[in-house]
């Protein structure tokens, strides 16, 4: 449907370099990256707000690079929602329809239909300043969807919401997508949004799109250490592999496949299980470790473990920490399955 070809742009402090990807019909495509990676600049180029220095954008095979925003039939939701403060919710949602010269009765019908679907039909007489953050976001989404855009562009759509409201809107976004059948490009730094909503994801680091693929594949099989570290592979180990065994100091770690020579592997902290004593487990990698640090992260706790000079980090729940009575300086057992190990190419 949409094809982005070799887009480059120097814009203020941002630099985009040779960005290329495609978006399929009906897909929810996530652009995931840290703050300052150029995600918003890329989205605004796709929207037609900013012109690229090089490259082009194709919609169904037609070059739309020079087409102004109002000619693209895209809906763009900026991070601050950009609702008109002097207008009611009804008039905000109706704005795009009125620009398209839609008859008044049809405007009213379409606005009420989308408002009912998004659960804001009781707010149509209100002004944006009287709404909660979640309600404002629903209004912004309604305004975007009511015109039936070919492409929905969303810039950090849930960034300004509290955790509970965000989780609810993510669940509802799935339902709205089924109901309205839209195609979306969604910019975010949130792993939760990417994993919950995305079909495919593009990882953006330092102005470059460094990996594109199915969301689950990218999260489980990052192509580089840079991508892996961004995606939460805190444990990256170097050793010498002999078939399915990796030698790291005095440790012998079973690998998911045969590898030979010097390699580097990654293990997510959440894939490491902690026991206070040796137990039977399907995991082939079980090691004694000393707890060198305990970091409180709220619902989770991060443990820093020393496995014979090899430092690993593991997540456990707060309740597990209390139940097991884990303290700094104590010895525990750390286990992880061979299938949880990612071998870098």
Curated annotation (Swiss-Prot):
Main location group: membrane
Bilayer disposition of the protein: Peripheral membrane protein
One GO cellular component, as annotated: plasma membrane
Catalytic activity: tungstate(in) + ATP + H2O = tungstate(out) + ADP + phosphate + H(+)
SUPFAM superfamilies noted in UniProt: MOP-like, P-loop containing nucleoside triphosphate hydrolases
CDD domains: ABC_ModC_like
Domain ABC transporter: 2-231
Binding site for ATP: 33-40
Location of this chain's protein in the cell: Cell membrane
MF term (GO), any: ABC-type tungstate transporter activity
The protein's Enzyme Commission number: 7.3.2.6
Family of this protein: Belongs to the ABC transporter superfamily. Sulfate/tungstate importer (TC 3.A.1.6) family.
Function: Part of the ABC transporter complex WtpABC involved in molybdate/tungstate import. Responsible for energy coupling to the transport system.
Protein name: Molybdate/tungstate import ATP-binding protein WtpC
Gene name in the database record: wtpC
